[in-house]
Structure formats: structure tokens, C-alpha cells
């Protein structure tokens, strides 16, 4: 919740040095059982801008459209894909224990976020002009 623009710039510079195969980014979402419970959640549009910037900086990296995006906006995961994310990760946790993995309040557990909604997720991704590929998921680099 205390991240500044200067922090983000420093993070982007660090990522340039690191050249990671996968970059996860998502908005802050407060959790009721933490000292940050009263802090405002992260901004959807700022997160989407950063996903787009990361895509331009790292054309071959895997960048997930996170569950957090889908939790703060109904179409958050779709928006993430539209601005440059190229990975979705359905929730594979067994249904009887999902609520125990409670990273933040109002985490999306059902529908397209869950493995039970895989066909719906495939249709959604298809409608955006993309295809779901079930593979090991290695980053495709020019130098490899």
C-alpha cells in the first residue's frame, strides 16, 4: 500500500537487469486479518498500465493476468490479457480447501477462476483472439 512511483521505477530497472522468464504483477488487495486491512486496494488502471509497460520491456516473458485483477474488477483478467499479459492460471486447489488459501478478501474462487470453469475460460480467451495452451510454459526467447 505504500509503493511510490519511484519504487515502481526502481523495480522496473531491477527487472531490466534480471531479465526474468516470468513476471507476476497484481494490485494490492487488503486482508482483514492484517495491519493493512484499512488500506485502499491497488488501482486497476495503474496495474494494467504496468502490465502493458512490462510487455513492451519484456516481449518474451510470461506475464500472468492474475486472480487479483479478476478479484478487483469483474473483467480484470480479460483486461490484463488485452494489455499484454499472456498467462492465466486457474485455481487447481480442491474445492473443500480453497477458502483456507485466503490471501486477500473477496478472492475470486468460482467461475472462470476455478478449474471447474476451464471450458468457460477457454471460450473467454478465444473471444479475445487468443488460445489456451496447456504445456510446460517455458518463455520463448530469441536467444534460446
Indicate residue ranges for each PLM-predicted region.
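Active-site glycine- and acidic-residue-rich loops that bind
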Residues: 1-11, 67-74
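Auxiliary Fe-S-binding modules of radical SAM enzymes
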Residues: 16-144
